[in-house]
Amino acid sequence: MDMANQLLDELAHGNFSHLTLNLSQNGREIAILQKQLTGFDDKQLETFVEQHPAMPNDTRFKIMCTSFLNYARDVDPWSAWSSSDLIFEFYQCLINCLINDNAPHIEMLIPVATRETEFIINLAGKLDSFHLQLHTRSHQFLSHISSILSRLFNSIKPPRGNASSTNIPGKQRILLYLVNKLNNIYFRIESPQLCSNIFKNFQPKSMLAHFNEYQLDQQIEYRYLLGRYYLLNSQVHNAFVQFNEAFQSLLNLPLTNQAITRNGTRILNYMIPTGLILGKMVKWGPLRPFLSQETIDNWSVLYKHVRYGNIQGVSLWLRQNERHLCARQLLIVLLEKLPMVTYRNLIKTVIKSWTTEWGQNKLPYSLIERVLQLSIGPTFEDPGAQEITIYNGIHSPKNVENVLVTLINLGLLRANCFPQLQLCVVKKTTMIQEIVPPVNERITKMFPAHSHVLW
């Protein structure tokens, strides 16, 4: 029992160098412990910890120590699955120690908890990837980790006002780390709606001075996740504000670091389509360190279709990229938002030609219908159409008035429709922006960023 006594003595005095589930770091010590603890049942190990002379008088701390000895005694180094109960039991006991603000050696336990969290999330993800073979539920292990971390999150009160990080408990210094881990897990287990409670209880605007003291990479990650949450809820402007702030902050970090470059790519995967919905045109030059030429070329094709009002081109692009758009939960929001921006650009082109070159301010519905036919291409209404899809089932040249009225209601077109006369009348002017305002200007006026977003 020499090794077990030595381990408990280390733990009792706040030395947690051997307290890890990662056998690549403490495999030798675990092998010795396993040999020494063979023959001890759970009750004997519990008594052994309880009677150790140096052990602090803290129930949760003792339970954690006992759990680690159980793990050392029974772990199978060749099978994470067969040892999973032991692994997750110890991790839960470790996190439970931190729930108590007066836990022994809490300042030293905090970095242990973050280190083991990285290990356990990686392990849980691997086990979940084999859920069919293991006959477990989809995302079972990551969901369990999220429930453990959420209890720790709920035990930490976010700082308020201008409190300095030197005057707050250590747990609050890992609060943003916990927030990001939980939100990342919720996205991974396909339950992003669970992020709502996290964002509701952690609002940087009410603790701005303290928020800015967190590590910059954690601030960037928080904004990225908040942007994704807003985008899933169709709050496009709010989402873009967060993606843009995250990306601008990331540019302050050394781009020689590959992890930073990868994070930049993650942000741009959402910032680019969000900006397109808002009518923003991308300057690709500054983005080249983060995007491959193939990716730039692919997005450029979509930008071109939207800019020139090509509904058929937009639908084809979405269909061709359906798989990766679904993986990023972008398909629905693009299907919902992009067509009206594309229609707006199409009608703008018609008005420019009709009013500038011909001096007319009355657009016949028949003219617009013909333009829509060219833009939309074959539809499900055509005799030769084979199927109705999410791409062709909504667009029809017959929807002239519907398109015009929707654009007018959205503030993207200043005009009057006269159904009986089959005319759309616009202002007589060569200043096209007076008839077709910029998309970004209109959206930001109609859907301004929430006050709690601007921080």
UniProtKB/Swiss-Prot annotation:
InterPro entries the record matches: Csn12-like, PCI_dom
Key words of the record: mRNA transport, Nucleus, Transport
Domain PCI: 220-431
GO MF, one annotated term: RNA binding
PROSITE patterns per record: PCI
One GO CC annotation: transcription export complex 2
Subcellular location(s) per record: Nucleus envelope
Gene Ontology terms: biological process: cellular bud site selection; mRNA 3'-end processing; mRNA export from nucleus; nuclear mRNA surveillance; poly(A)+ mRNA export from nucleus; positive regulation of transcription by RNA polymerase II; post-transcriptional tethering of RNA polymerase II gene DNA at nuclear periphery; transcription elongation by RNA polymerase II
More info: Present with 1140 molecules/cell in log phase SD medium.
Subunit-level organization: Heterodimer with THP1. The SAC3-THP1 complex interacts with CDC31 and SUS1, and with the mRNA export factor MEX67-MTR2, the TREX complex component SUB2, and the nucleoporin NUP1.
Annotated protein name in UniProt: Nuclear mRNA export protein THP1
Species of the source: Saccharomyces cerevisiae (strain ATCC 204508 / S288c)
Taxon lineage: Eukaryota, Fungi, Dikarya, Ascomycota, Saccharomycotina
